[in-house]
């Protein structure tokens, strides 16, 4: 190992003096032999340069003539070293400079100084301080040991360099770090010098040269919670000991840390290998550091990738969440469907109409018992009163003369019956010779109630007495409220069979303001006579629901419905052979039956058009208004002429034929869809709201639709058979009592009701959603 002090080289004397003058403190370190490619650091540009091979110089001569390694400047921690040659300078990088083949270094220049390159912006790559260790000789490669150079120079021209022997022990550097021989000698926590290659956002790509090995890696910024580009980084928080004091924890960690050291001292130093030393160091580091807590408040939930990669480590977990369990709602339900069906039944079983029928039957039975008890006592008295009345009528006819007798022979009788809950009154209104007298007489008859009532009561009692002997009276009272019925009068032995009677019921919802439409007809009927008009044609236009207000009179005495139906055999004689038609006008509070005589010859289905409209409480369907013009012919004749048995038998046969011809047929048909009078189209399978008395609006499904019409095409009723949701029961309701389910949901739904009501609503909603227009069209494609 030869010192290079005083070895000038080519142009060394002048150059060294100039360098010493221009750059104060410059010191010659030594000569370095290298391969033909030589490197040097320019003192002025302060950058690494590559020296091209000298012209005309061979490799052998070039190997001996190596460049000079000099210290170009000393500025505190940053020291710059350069290689001086006479060749031209070419810029080189730090990697090229560090990658010089160390095998061609001359043996006398084994010891060299490690370079600390300056951190200047013009450098391509900024070096970072690192520690180099000596590499043992292997083949042509020579180990390099770096150490601090000691200088002793008094002037700038001569300099002496003292080198210490290179051995395997660690050498202290200027940075205060420790470097040992071999890669196994590297200890975690020591500082090394790396080279910065690339800067990528939050990551740094660095390289580290250790002897003939080059290591590279990525350094990530840990100031953020997770690494760059979504790569998470585990940062374990410090364990917080809440139960144990700090001193006891430190003593435990120290005692555990000392145990492996004692074991290592017991073993011989020759048996311990570097790998075992490294493993011991790792174990010591793991146990000396405090493990992270298993659970602490405020810890973020770890990403799932780290849970998979860290099975045996404690990971911070968030506090356990409270699991909300819904409370079970207990519904008190009946075990069987029978109880559900019973629950759906209304509290009031009978409607208003049925109640009236039942009450009327009960009252009628009671009155029949009381009347039958008094029948025997007043039998003679009643018979005598009837004979006296007949005698008075005969004497009146004789006094008045033949003209009056003929004029009164065929005068029609208008009988008005006022029915209210089984009680009624019969008023006989005979017609007069003039219209003015008829109007005055009508007022007088309505005012003289007592006299007319006594006569009518006697006639009714006598008729009831005869009827009880032959037939039961209760049969006729049950048919009093039938919808459209044809009844034959009860036969008497003396009077024979009366003509059939048609009872017509209007709708209840009509107002009674237009009740005066029948007034002119009734006045004309009363004023008809034989002398002036032999055949008076009576025309009356009637609308459904209109009730004559003049004829309505309060009932002064209770009478039975059945007796009122039977009293016509006394008022109208059978030999007149006239049809009687009952026009039953039912108002909102009372029933009024008007009897009018019709000519037998012209009273048929073609000459007299009959208008019938059915209205019941349970069937409130909206029908088209029934209005028609009816023509009645009233033949001249007298009143109450005596009859014979032959005429009564002949009239009974003729009346049977007429009754068959006057019967109005009614047809019913099941349809798949129907249009209501208000314009709505209802189909089979629709989900609707339905209402029953005593129940809320309930969802139902239409099973069938029945439309009833007369032979003339007049609409009578529109009825639907429905099944209730949540119940196995079915009902028959009018289409007017049904409303669409989805359209009227907000107005019909009751939020306060629960239980079966909610279940029925849920089922109906599901069924309504499934009922698409396509399904509805398929259901209504074919009519049944």
Swiss-Prot record:
PROSITE patterns registered for this protein in UniProt: PWWP (PS50812)
Observed phenotype of the null mutant: Embryos exhibit lack of retinal tissue combined with a reduced head size. Defects in neural crest stem cell migration and differentiation seen.
Biased composition (Basic and acidic residues): 244-266
Keyword Calcium tagged: no
Compartments, as annotated in UniProt: Nucleus
Location (main, coarse): nucleus
UniProt region (Disordered), positions on chain: 1-32, 244-272, 463-567, 605-654
One Gene Ontology cellular component: nucleus
Residue ranges with Polar residues bias: 536-556
Extent of Low complexity compositional bias: 605-614
Name of the protein this chain belongs to: PWWP domain-containing protein 2A
Organism: Xenopus tropicalis (Western clawed frog)
């Amino acid at each position: 190992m030869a010192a290079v002090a005083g070895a000038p080289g080519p142009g060394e004397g002048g150059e060294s003096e100039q360098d010493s003058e221009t750059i104060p403190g410059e010191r010659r370190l030594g000569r370095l032999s290298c391969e033909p490619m030589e490197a040097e650091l320019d003192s002025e540009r302060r950058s690494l340069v590559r020296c091209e091979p000298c012209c005309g110089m061979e490799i052998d001569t070039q190997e001996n003539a190596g460049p000079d390694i000099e210290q170009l400047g000393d500025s505190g921690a940053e020291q710059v070293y350069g290689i001086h040659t006479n060749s031209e300078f070419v810029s080189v990088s730090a990697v090229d400079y560090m990658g010089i083949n160390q095998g061609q270094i001359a043996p006398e220049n084994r010891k060299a100084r490690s370079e600390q390159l300056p951190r200047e912006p013009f450098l391509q790559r900024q070096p970072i301080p690192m520690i180099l260790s000596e590499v043992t000789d292997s083949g042509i490669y020579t180990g390099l040991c770096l150490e601090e150079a000691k200088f002793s120079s008094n002037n700038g021209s001569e300099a002496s360099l003292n080198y210490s022997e290179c051995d395997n022990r660690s050498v202290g550097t200027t940075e205060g770090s420790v470097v040992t021989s071999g890669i196994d000698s590297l200890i975690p926590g020591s500082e090394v010098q790396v080279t910065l290659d690339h800067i990528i956002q939050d990551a740094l790509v660095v390289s580290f040269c250790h002897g003939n090995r080059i290591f590279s890696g990525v350094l990530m910024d840990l100031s953020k919670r997770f690494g760059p580009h979504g790569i998470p980084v585990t940062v374990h928080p410090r364990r917080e000991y809440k139960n144990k004091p700090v001193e006891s924890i430190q003593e435990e960690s120290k005692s555990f840390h000392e145990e492996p050291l004692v074991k290592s001292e017991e073993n011989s130093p020759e048996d311990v290998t570097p790998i075992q030393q490294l493993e011991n160091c790792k174990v010591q580091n793991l146990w000396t550091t405090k493990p992270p807590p298993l659970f602490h408040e405020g810890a973020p939930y770890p990403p799932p990738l780290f849970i998979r990669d860290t099975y045996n480590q404690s990971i911070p977990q968030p506090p356990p969440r409270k699991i909300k369990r819904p409370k079970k709602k207990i519904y008190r339900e009946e075990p069987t469907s029978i109880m559900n069906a019973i629950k759906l039944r209304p509290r009031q079983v009978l409607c208003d109409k049925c109640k009236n029928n039942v009450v009327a039957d009960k009252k009628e039975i009671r009155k029949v018992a009381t009347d039958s008890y008094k029948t025997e006592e007043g039998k003679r008295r009643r018979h005598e009163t009837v004979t006296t009345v007949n005698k008075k009528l005969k004497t009146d006819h004789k006094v008045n003369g033949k003209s009056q007798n003929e004029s009164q022979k065929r005068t029609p009788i208008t009988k008005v019956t006022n029915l209210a809950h089984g009680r009624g009154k019969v008023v006989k209104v005979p017609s007069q010779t003039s219209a003015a007298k008829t109007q005055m007489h009508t007022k007088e008859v309505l005012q003289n109630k007592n006299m007319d009532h006594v006569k009518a009561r006697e006639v009714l009692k006598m008729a009831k007495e005869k009827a009880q002997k032959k037939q039961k009276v209760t049969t006729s009272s049950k048919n009093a409220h039938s919808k459209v019925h044809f009844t034959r009068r009860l036969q008497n032995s003396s009077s024979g069979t009366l003509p059939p009677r048609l009872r017509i019921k209007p709708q209840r919802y009509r107002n009674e303001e237009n009740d005066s439409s029948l007034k002119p007809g009734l006045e004309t009927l009363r004023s008809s006579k034989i002398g002036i008009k032999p055949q008076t044609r009576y025309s009356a236009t009637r609308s459904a629901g209109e009730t004559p207000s003049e004829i309505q009179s309060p009932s002064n005495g209770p009478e039975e419905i059945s007796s009122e139906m039977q009293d016509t055999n006394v008022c109208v004689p059978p030999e007149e052979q006239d049809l009687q038609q009952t026009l039953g006008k039912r108002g909102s509070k009372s029933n009024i039956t008007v009897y009018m005589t019709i000519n037998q010859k012209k009273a048929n289905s073609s000459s007299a058009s009959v208008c019938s409209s059915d209205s019941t409480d349970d069937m409130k369907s909206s029908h088209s208004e029934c209005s028609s013009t009816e023509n009645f012919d009233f033949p001249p004749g007298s009143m109450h002429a005596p009859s014979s048995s032959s005429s009564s038998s002949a009239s009974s046969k003729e009346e049977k034929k007429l009754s068959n011809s006057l019967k109005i047929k009614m047809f019913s048909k099941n349809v798949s869809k129907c249009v209501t009078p208000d314009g709505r189209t209802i189909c089979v399978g629709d989900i609707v709201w339905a209402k029953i008395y005593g129940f809320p609006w309930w969802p139902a499904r239409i099973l069938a639709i029945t439309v009833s019409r007369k032979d003339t095409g007049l609409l009578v009723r529109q009825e639907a058979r429905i099944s209730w949701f949540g119940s196995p029961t079915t009902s028959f309701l009018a289409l007017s009592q049904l409303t669409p389910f989805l359209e009227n949901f907000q107005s019909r739904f009751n939020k306060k009701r629960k239980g079966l009501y909610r279940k029925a609503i849920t089922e109906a909603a599901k069924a309504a959603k499934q009922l698409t227009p396509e399904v509805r069209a398929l259901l209504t494609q074919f009519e049944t």
